[in-house]
């Protein structure tokens, strides 16, 4: 049994052990009220659960069905990645290249559209959303890109527009009686700008039409690039989040930054020596956080900036199962000190994605990050994130009663 779960079970047992005493009913009622107040203070700030591409661990990503399932499983927000079609519509796809997430490669009528394109400095072959009208996109069907995940829903669901995602979320908000929001990402803004299909104005127009173009709307806008967030900060009061990537983790736990994924692509094309000298890692320094705080509400770092991993000589199994956890960094505390929230990505259930310390149980990973003070998590498995949050609430309630 892992340490976080052992601790929770011990605290749970303690909660139900009646302590002896001779207090009056009034005293007991007062103490009970005080405990309740403390518990409420402890539980009032809980991390957001963001359905990463919807419930993408179970259904083909970025479909209305995946978003709806994430909401049913308890997501506070769902995340549509946005790319543009040839005729300027915003659709939910993880990349402009749709070869891996749709059935386009099996459609003979579109065979001539296959080509090589350069996206953020990397050449890739496939089919690109900007070569298709929305009407053509609507004839395609989504598929699950990861082979270890359920494949039986391939070919069943269409590709939604941003407006359709917003309509779904608004309907679910009414059905569930709780606030549900969207967390759109502007994918490859520099790439889309070069195509004459800029994303920012189209996104803000859709939010305005939905009544969501304001600070208190249930919306976060995220991007890996910096200049488009700065531009957005001058056009909208919607909360903005600076994503922070890295390419890999080295054996010693340090993060690897390999071109062209070593920095925001708008830095790469800027030609500015001071930006070309930086990597994404700069954004996690005190100076970088101070800079981000000038235009953004928060940061969205890869979780390895918060808890990295190192090679485990005794580790076995695939992927990260062969690695163990490094000591947590102080990024969350420093970001909070700079006035920024922290929403980390991506949390997944598969064994190959869990370092050995978690003993094969993804709940343990969530609990660690929750206990470190994370403000939100992007999860492929919303239900697991929500269960872990319930355990966090229990832990806080027990701790408050023990005060």
Predicted features along the sequence, with ranges:
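Phosphate-group recognition and catalysis centered on beta-loop-alpha active-site segments
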Residues: 22-403
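Bacterial N-terminal signal peptides
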Residues: 10-19
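Bacterial N-terminal signal peptides that target proteins for export
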Residues: 1-9
């Amino acid at each position: 049994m892992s340490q976080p779960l052992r601790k929770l079970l011990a605290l749970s047992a303690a909660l139900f052990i009646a302590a002896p005493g001779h207090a009056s009913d009034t005293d007991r009622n007062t103490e009970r009220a005080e405990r309740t107040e403390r518990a409420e203070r402890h539980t009032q700030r809980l991390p957001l659960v963001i359905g990463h591409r919807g419930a993408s661990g179970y259904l083909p990503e970025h479909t209305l069905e995946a978003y709806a399932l994430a909401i049913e499983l308890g997501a506070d927000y769902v995340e549509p990645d946005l790319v543009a079609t040839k005729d300027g519509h915003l659709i939910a796809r993880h990349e402009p290249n749709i070869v891996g997430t749709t059935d386009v490669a099996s459609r003979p009528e579109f065979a001539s559209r296959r080509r090589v394109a350069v996206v953020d400095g990397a050449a890739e072959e496939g089919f690109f959303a900007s070569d298709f009208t929305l009407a053509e996109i609507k004839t395609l069907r989504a598929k699950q890109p990861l082979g270890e995940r359920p494949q039986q829903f391939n070919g069943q669901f269409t590709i939604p527009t941003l407006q359709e995602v917003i309509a779904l979320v608004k309907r679910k908000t009414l059905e569930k009686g709780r606030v549900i929001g969207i967390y759109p990402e502007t994918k490859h803004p520099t790439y889309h700008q070069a195509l004459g299909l800029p994303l920012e104005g189209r996104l803000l127009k859709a939010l305005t039409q939905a009544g969501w173009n304001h600070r208190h709307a249930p919306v976060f806008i995220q991007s890996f690039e910096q200049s488009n967030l700065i531009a957005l900060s001058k056009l909208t009061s919607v909360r903005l989040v600076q994503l922070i990537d890295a390419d890999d983790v080295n054996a010693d736990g340090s993060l690897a930054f390999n071109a062209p994924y070593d920095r925001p692509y708008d830095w790469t094309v800027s030609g500015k020596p001071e930006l070309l000298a930086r990597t994404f890692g700069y954004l996690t320094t005190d100076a970088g956080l101070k800079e981000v705080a000038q235009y953004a509400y928060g940061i969205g770092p890869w979780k390895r900036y918060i808890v990295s991993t190192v090679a485990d000589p005794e580790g076995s199994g695939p992927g990260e199962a062969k690695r163990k956890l490094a000591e947590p960094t102080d990024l969350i505390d420093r970001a909070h000190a700079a006035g920024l929230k922290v929403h980390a990505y991506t949390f997944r259930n598969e064994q190959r994605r869990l370092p050995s310390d978690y003993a094969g149980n993804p709940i343990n990973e969530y609990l660690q990050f929750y206990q470190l003070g994370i403000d939100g998590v992007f999860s492929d498995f919303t239900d697991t994130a929500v269960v872990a949050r319930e355990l966090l609430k229990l832990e806080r309630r027990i701790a408050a009663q023990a005060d």
